């Protein structure tokens, strides 16, 4: 079987957010684009984290445990005041665009990641998920 590089299967140039962005902006992106992970960039465009739909769900889910009649308005205020840096996963593992799908598979097996940013010369050029790794093997 020929070697398949991540450049062949990754989502190219994914949507990104910055660490200082309010969480509500990320929530809006998740809803509008039906995606589940967004790389977080610093002001100088370096990957500093990743935020997932689960991160946002956990933020609001904790509030919903309380029988508070103002829960919805509190959740709304929380989404506007919390920053991405407060909920993102830091110290994200990254892969290189020339790495193979086998390399990515090894990372997904050994770590608890559901998406990995893909870099080329230190710049974000894509994101890969476990689903992306099986695409070359699915025939129509």
Show the residue positions of the predicted features.
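A glycine-centered beta-loop-beta connector
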Residues: 30, 38-55, 108, 116-132
């Amino acid at each position: 079987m020929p070697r398949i590089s991540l450049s062949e299967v990754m989502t190219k140039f994914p949507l990104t957010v910055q660490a200082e962005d309010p969480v509500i902006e990320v929530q809006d992106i998740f809803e509008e684009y039906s995606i589940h992970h967004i790389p977080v960039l610093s002001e100088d465009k370096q990957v500093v984290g990743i935020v997932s739909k689960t991160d946002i769900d956990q933020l609001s889910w904790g509030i919903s445990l309380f029988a508070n009649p103002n829960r919805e308005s509190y959740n709304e205020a929380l989404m506007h005041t919390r920053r991405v840096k407060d909920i993102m996963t830091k110290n994200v593992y990254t892969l290189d665009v020339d790495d193979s799908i086998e390399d990515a598979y090894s990372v997904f097996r050994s770590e608890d990641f559901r998406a990995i940013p893909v870099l080329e010369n230190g710049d974000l050029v894509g994101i890969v998920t476990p689903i992306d790794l099986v695409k070359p093997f699915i025939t129509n």
